[in-house]
Curated annotation (Swiss-Prot):
Expressed in leaves. The lineage of its organism: Eukaryota, Viridiplantae, Streptophyta, Embryophyta, Tracheophyta. It comes from Antirrhinum majus (Garden snapdragon). This is (S)-8-oxocitronellyl enol synthase. CDD domains: 5beta-POR_like_SDR_a. NADP(+) binds at residues 36-38, 64-65, 82-83, 106-107, 140, 177, 211-213. It is an enzyme of class 1 (oxidoreductase).
Length: 387
């Protein structure tokens, strides 16, 4: 029974590597770029376990903000760096000459093709010439590979219809995902023997209080505000998004997917979709969210959708009250919640990705999406980021 399958059914020990003042011997050295985000933090946690394939792992974590306290327990060697700055990136990352694996899970927070491309290029240019033992480059993109920038769609440029398959052609529009993937292909040419993998996740369910792409924390904050104001949890999106099928990926499963592609020879030099292996509807998940916060759930009722970002625009002080009342870790509303992301999701249509290629190449990891959703909420509570 593989480690990945045992993780999926909860039969791994998940014991962390113990340092105890002794310099351990590492088999692999990871550079996680975007370590404070939802994917990066999940990967850092998975690499901290003693039974993780390829380990024991030494971990460097790069992010722009100061190292958060919740990340410190994972034994990450933190590198605060603005990777949009070429000189700063080289000065801070090039000296890390023992790197064996790059895991790139960062973006600038916009669709800026040039800036996102520069950021990844700065990392590759800093590591590839200076890390003689570099073996593998992992890149996270996503399902925007298939449906692109909706604002640029017209009659001659339409998104692919789902289910999405990895061999679908690129859309006829600018998309920084395409540029990043091209940089991956180029990196394999630059260094002989360097392997790569590209990961295209669905919605990511997981833990991070400072991620620009955390649907769970955003909805938790919305629910907490509704409860604080004695209001029901109202679904703000369209009928289509309410009733259609969705897929998501647990951040732990995503981390396992990264490790599988980086350590199993058969999986290298490929692009893969990644999701939990099941589907869900928001009409069902909405009740789960409301139950977790003990409030009334009101679903789609035929009304015009409203922007959650507009509803929450004057709620900064309300969130401050909630943080104080429940003695939570201090956060600002705009840091812990990305209401624009919820608005994108709640105005979209089904985005289902095929997992057949994963099975053909041997990846059998999975998660129950409802359990993943609840687990993510509980983890946010355990770290005292939500009431």
């Amino acid at each position: 029974m593989s480690w990945w399958y045992r993780r999926s059914i909860g039969e791994t020990e998940q014991k962390r590597i113990e340092i105890n003042g002794v310099s351990p011997t590492y088999q692999s050295v990871a550079l996680i770029v975007g370590v404070t985000g939802i994917a990066g933090s999940g990967l850092a946690e998975t690499l901290s376990f003693s039974d993780t394939p390829g380990g024991p792992w030494k971990v460097y974590g790069v992010a722009r903000r100061p190292c958060p306290k919740w990340l410190a327990k994972l034994n990450v060697n933190y590198v605060q760096c603005d990777i949009a700055n070429t000189d700063e990136t080289y000065s801070k990352v090039a000296p890390l000459t023992d790197i064996t694996h790059i895991f790139y899970v960062s973006w600038t927070g916009s669709e800026d093709v040039a800036l996102n491309t520069l950021m990844f290029k700065n990392i590759l240019d800093s590591v590839i010439p200076n890390a003689p033992n570099l073996k593998h480059v992992s890149l996270q993109t996503g399902i925007k590979y298939y449906w692109g920038n909706m604002a640029e769609m017209d009659s001659t440029n339409q998104p692919h219809e789902c289910p999405f398959y990895e061999n679908m052609p690129r859309l006829k529009q600018d998309n920084f995902y395409y540029n990043l993937e091209d940089l991956v292909y180029d990196s394999a040419v630059r260094k002989n023997g360097l392997s790569w993998s590209i990961h295209r996740p669905a919605l990511i369910f997981g833990f991070s209080p400072c991620s620009m792409m955390n649907t769970v924390s955003t909805l938790c904050v919305y629910a907490a505000i509704c409860k604080h104001e004695n209001k029901p949890l109202v679904y703000t999106g369209t009928e289509t998004s309410w009733t259609c099928l969705w897929d998501a990926v647990d951040s732990d499963l995503l981390a396992e997917h990264f490790l599988w592609a980086a350590t199993v020879p058969n999986a290298k030099n490929q692009a893969f979709n990644i999701n939990n292996g099941d589907v869900f509807k928001w009409k069902h998940m909405w009740k789960v969210l409301a139950k977790e916060f003990d409030i009334e759930a009101i679903g789609y009722e035929g009304k015009e959708p409203v922007l959650l970002e507009d509803l929450m625009k004057d709620k900064d002080s309300v969130w401050d009250e909630i943080v104080k009342k429940h003695d939570l870790v201090p956060t600002k509303l705009r840091d812990i919640a990305a209401f624009w992301l919820a608005d994108v999701v709640f105005r979209n249509k089904e985005t289902l990705c095929s997992m057949n290629k994963n099975k053909e190449f041997g990846f059998m990891g999975f998660r129950d999406t409802t359990k993943s959703f609840v687990s993510s909420i509980n983890k946010m509570r355990d770290f005292k980021f939500i009431p």
